[in-house]
Amino acid sequence: MPIRIPDALPAVNFLRNENVFVMTDSRAAVQEIRPLKVLLLNLMPKKIETENQFLRLLSNSPLQIDIQLLRIDRRESKNTPMEHLNNFYCHFEDIQQENFDGLVVTGAPLGQVDFGDVAYWSQIVQVIEWARAHVTSTLFVCWAAQAALNILYGLPKMTRAQKLSGVYEHQTLNPLALLTRGFDEGFLAPHSRYADFPPQAIREHTDLQIFAESAQAGAYLFASVDKRTVFVTGHPEYDAHTLGAEYWRDLHAGLTPALPFNYFPQDNSDGTPLATWRSHGHLLFSNWLNYCVYQITPYDLRQMNPTLE
């Protein structure tokens, strides 16, 4: 089944060109089925690119999904046309009285910025606190995972001395876990972050269950027992070229970035990298939508039960 997005959103044609099943609002309106309401809080500067990446993963499900795009930073964007933001994004006050089946919070290029110095930190706190009563399950990605650990569990910001960039091997830890159902015991996932997620710190200071981790990248996938908060520390949504684009961007800016690990063929930056993580990225989002959202959320969202008992 498809995701449901506005007819004029650029992602419609982008995803259809990839043979992704997309349903526009006009077509979905005649279907007598309740779609899942999923809110996407997009914190990345290049919002259209990020929309495409996440909508691709959210579309690979037998469920119809009604996507609402959310922004909380009212500053003028240098990377996304204001017309696009005005046409397709809502502000928090527009939806704060509503309930949603799912919320995805993207990463943000804020790895070396203290939480208190983030321009929209108070809004991040507000959304995450709001989600506890208004969203069945929230998926935090990369920087958002670090922010949520601080807000919900009081974990201090942990930062690596060197940026973690590359495609790393991970291992699943529980063969019966629903979030990793269908995963290979070892799988690849890309990372691009300064944030550090030591498994020991998560086990000692939270009640979260870790389902996949990496000897090099640390904890990758973990969640609360009730499945209402799910954390992914990498970037399963990345395109094949994204890590390379970040590398060349930093290089051209006069920085000395390390070559992304296990990314370019034979570590030759002139080579064309392959998206070796794509299948597990799709499976992760499909499992989250099915087991953490669809199987738990009430049919009538007006009857939202924050404890999911």
UniProtKB/Swiss-Prot annotation:
Keywords: Acyltransferase, Amino-acid biosynthesis, Cytoplasm, Methionine biosynthesis, Transferase. GO terms for biological process: L-methionine biosynthetic process from homoserine via O-succinyl-L-homoserine and cystathionine. Pathway: Amino-acid biosynthesis; L-methionine biosynthesis via de novo pathway; O-succinyl-L-homoserine from L-homoserine: step 1/1. Substrate binds at K163, S192, R249. InterPro entries: Class_I_gatase-like, HST_MetA, MetA_family. The active site is at C142 (acyl-thioester intermediate), H235 (proton acceptor), E237. Its EC number is 2.3.1.46. It catalyses: L-homoserine + succinyl-CoA = O-succinyl-L-homoserine + CoA. GO terms for molecular function: homoserine O-acetyltransferase activity; homoserine O-succinyltransferase activity. It comes from the Bacteria. The record marks G111 as: Important for acyl-CoA specificity. It is an enzyme of class 2 (transferase). GO terms for cellular component: cytoplasm. It is found in: Cytoplasm. It holds the Pfam family HTS. The record marks S192 as: Important for substrate specificity. Transfers a succinyl group from succinyl-CoA to L-homoserine, forming succinyl-L-homoserine. NCBIfam families: metA. Belongs to the MetA family. This is Homoserine O-succinyltransferase. It comes from Edwardsiella ictaluri (strain 93-146).
